[in-house]
């Protein structure tokens, strides 16, 4: 295998990988139907007849605003649902001054509900608890590390206090229910938390396949996606200790994390164009003249791996690197480390590429050396083909003898390339999943490494670097079709990369430039050994 053919193989593997990734997004195999809980739809409030009706129902109560340094929540006092969350440290778009709105009721339904159901529950299909608050706006003041917002409701001698606690610099919101039973009767309630989202197709494409849908974690499964399509086909119903449920989109996630010491039921359903994924906690009994507290957490923010890992076990797995996670995770932390020194994400990408290419240099050298030896054997191999052309078995045996005699591995040029592909795939997902690259500038015209190059300069430079690599590489390909494909490969890649995130194109361009230098060094060494003749 020569260098030009290596480029062809690399290109075909890349295209195949991207097509397969998009196929998974569009045609995920149908799952096995799961048993559905009989009382699930009876106890937990569910979607009403239309999306508009849901919006009206969820916003007809009084709303209050709670604001920390990084998060702004709008809470409906009717039920205490979070109907909006603004991520103050993340802009809606590169040119916007408005914060990104994650939870919202504008244009679609995306809300986080929680409440108490069961025998004496205060949240039913008929109505929700009308909580009372002391003010309409709560703001984290300077010097404060957290802001506590209590909402109260009294019914039949029982005082219910639903409390939201926001901490400085955190997207992890503590949501608790304090139940003070001042009545003469024992009451039973069951906590729940659920996320509602309008049914949508994934917003991904071939260049940037992304996932919008549900996910959960249980005692049996650390992390598993549960797509809108799967929710439509079969309701989720899993009993687990601890666990969590989440709604994912590119770079951001909302998740309910129940009491991790309790036995919970994770569930999902779809109704009238709205998907719901949530949990039910265990039935809680509150005796007369006693008080009980039920705790949970709501995460609504970016996919910050470090912070999510602290918020809940396995929540950081929502940053999904696929099967190459064991390579991608170290690469991500390497990216973070280099950025902490350099301070520029584009330079950090180049730094990661340099480190990876340096570590892979022995494989690259072995690949080029093996290909050079194979080229030197071509005259002898051609003689064997002419001599034993009609006896393929004998010809194969003689070829193997020649390889053994010359100490050449015929697969030596291919194996190093194949071994490098998982690393490329891991790098691909590292750059695709890193929220840190969203709206991160490089220099000049590149102001967002997660978006395509607006002037297509990087893709063109990448294509030119591929063309230069081809010109530097010796070729022994005689097949006209292969020659044409390899000739047009830089053009095909240039067009293909026009819509890729500029950060990923920067990686590929940097990788090509480093390969050019490495190739020059390797060929110079091979010339000294008589294994390579420079192209003229």
From Swiss-Prot:
Residue spans crossing the bilayer: 7-27, 332-352, 411-431, 449-469, 488-508
Keyword Methyltransferase appears in the UniProt entry: no
GO cellular component: plasma membrane
Topology term for the membrane: Multi-pass membrane protein
GO molecular function (one): membrane insertase activity
Function description: Required for the insertion and/or proper folding and/or complex formation of integral membrane proteins into the membrane. Involved in integration of membrane proteins that insert both dependently and independently of the Sec translocase complex, as well as at least some lipoproteins. Aids folding of multispanning membrane proteins.
Complex formation: Interacts with the Sec translocase complex via SecD. Specifically interacts with transmembrane segments of nascent integral membrane proteins during membrane integration.
UniProt similarity note: Belongs to the OXA1/ALB3/YidC family. Type 1 subfamily.
NCBIfam families (UniProt xref): PRK01318.1-1, PRK01318.1-3, yidC_nterm, yidC_oxa1_cterm
Protein name: Membrane protein insertase YidC
């Amino acid at each position: 295998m020569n260098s030009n053919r290596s480029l062809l193989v690399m290109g075909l593997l890349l295209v195949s990988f991207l097509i397969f990734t998009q196929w998974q997004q569009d045609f995920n195999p149908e799952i096995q139907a799961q048993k559905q809980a009989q009382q699930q739809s009876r106890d937990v409030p569910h979607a009403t007849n239309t999306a508009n009706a849901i919006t009206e129902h969820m916003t007809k109560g009084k709303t209050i605003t709670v604001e920390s340094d990084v998060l702004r929540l709008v809470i409906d006092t009717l039920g205490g649902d979070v109907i909006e969350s603004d991520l103050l440290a993340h802009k809606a778009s590169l040119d916007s001054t408005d914060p990104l709105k994650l939870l919202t009721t504008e244009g679609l339904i995306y809300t986080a509900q929680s409440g108490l159901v069961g025998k004496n529950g205060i949240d039913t299909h008929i109505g929700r608890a009308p909580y009372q608050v002391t003010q309409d706006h709560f703001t984290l003041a300077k010097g404060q590390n957290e802001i506590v917002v209590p909402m109260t409701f009294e019914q039949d001698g029982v005082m219910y206090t639903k409390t939201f606690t926001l901490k400085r610099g955190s997207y992890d919101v503590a949501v608790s229910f304090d139940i003070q039973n001042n009545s003469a009767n024992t009451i039973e309630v069951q906590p729940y938390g659920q996320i509602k989202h309008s049914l949508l197709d994934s917003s991904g494409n071939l260049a940037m396949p992304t996932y919008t849908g549900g996910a959960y974690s249980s005692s049996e499964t650390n992390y598993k996606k549960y797509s809108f399509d799967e929710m439509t086909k079969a309701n989720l119903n899993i009993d687990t200790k601890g666990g969590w449920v989440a709604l994912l989109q590119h770079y951001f996630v909302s998740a309910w994390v129940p009491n991790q010491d309790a036995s919970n039921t994770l569930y999902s359903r779809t109704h009238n164009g709205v998907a719901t994924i949530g949990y039910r906690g265990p039935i809680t009994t509150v005796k007369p003249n006693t008080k009980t507290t039920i705790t949970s957490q709501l995460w609504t923010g970016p996919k910050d791996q470090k912070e999510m890992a602290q918020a809940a076990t396995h929540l950081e797995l929502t940053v999904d690197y696929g099967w190459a996670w064991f390579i991608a995770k170290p690469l991500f932390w390497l990216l973070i480390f280099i950025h902490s020194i350099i301070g520029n994400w584009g330079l950090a990408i180049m730094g990661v590429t340099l480190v990876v290419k340096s570590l892979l240099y022995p494989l690259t050298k072995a690949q080029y050396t093996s290909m050079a030896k194979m080229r030197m054997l071509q005259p002898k191999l051609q003689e064997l083909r002419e001599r034993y052309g009609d006896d393929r078995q004998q010809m194969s045996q003689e070829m193997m003898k020649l390889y053994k005699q010359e100490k050449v591995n015929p697969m030596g040029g291919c194996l190093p390339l194949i071994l490098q592909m998982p690393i490329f795939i891991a790098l691909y997902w590292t750059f695709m999943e890193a929220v840190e690259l969203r709206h991160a500038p490089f220099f000049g015209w590149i102001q967002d490494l997660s978006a395509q190059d607006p002037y297509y300069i990087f893709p063109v430079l990448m294509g030119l670097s591929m063309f230069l690599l081809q010109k530097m590489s010796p070729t022994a390909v005689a097949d006209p079709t292969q020659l044409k494909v390899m000739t047009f490969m830089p053009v095909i890649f240039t067009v293909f990369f026009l819509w890729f995130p500029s950060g990923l194109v920067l990686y590929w361009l940097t990788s090509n430039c480093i390969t050019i230098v490495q190739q020059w060094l390797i060929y110079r060494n091979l010339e000294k050994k008589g294994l390579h003749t420079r192209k003229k």
